[in-house]
A protein has these predicted regions:
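Short helix-adjacent coil turns
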Residues: 45-50, 99-106
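Short, solvent-exposed, charged loop/turn and helix-capping segments
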Residues: 65-83
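A structural signal for well-ordered alpha-helices, especially hydrophobic packing surfaces
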Residues: 35, 39, 66, 70, ...
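Acidic, low-complexity proline/glycine-rich segments
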Residues: 1-11
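Alpha-helical segments in soluble extracytoplasmic regions
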Residues: 40-69
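Short, well-ordered alpha-helical segments
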Residues: 31, 78-91
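Preference for long, well-ordered alpha-helical segments
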Residues: 105-141
Length: 141
């Protein structure tokens, strides 16, 4: 119990002290965690009473995080890249909605792969630019 309280405090402080670029990375991590938990729940036996609830909760959480990433885009300053990212986040959300409605794992696996690629690219950009450029290009996250 105490350890989880420390973990919550650490996460809260991490968010408060993170650069905009690091916040985007945290959002990707959160989306991947939720998507992964939903994917694992799909593997649970159909008679598991919490299976459907877990899938639904985790997919909704992932959709909410992806919506935050999408809402953070500055379509004017970000130009074509921001527009492309906006459409990509929209696609991710539609696929997760489809997975949730039809209770199919395929779209979850697809979106997990796509979001992981975005997360890796973002992390690489942060590492290469030491976070400085990430602050300037937050509008296209």
């Amino acid at each position: 119990m105490v350890a989880s309280g420390y973990a919550r405090t650490y996460r809260a402080n991490s968010v408060l002290t993170a650069s905009p670029g690091q916040l985007v990375l945290m959002l990707y991590d959160g989306a991947l965690k939720a998507i992964g938990l939903a994917r694992v729940a799909f593997e649970n036996p159909p008679e598991d009473p919490r299976r459907i609830e877990t899938i639904n909760q985790q997919l909704l959480k992932a959709q909410s995080i992806l919506a935050e990433l999408q809402n953070g885009l500055n379509l004017e300053a970000g130009g074509e890249l921001a527009s492309t990212m906006h459409r990509l986040y929209d696609y991710h959300n539609r696929r997760l909605m489809e997975a949730n409605l039809r209770k199919q794992v395929g779209p979850v696996i697809e979106v997990e792969r796509l979001v992981r690629e975005l997360r890796e690219a973002w992390a690489q950009m942060l590492a290469q630019n030491d976070g400085n450029a990430a602050d300037r290009v937050r509008s296209v996250a």
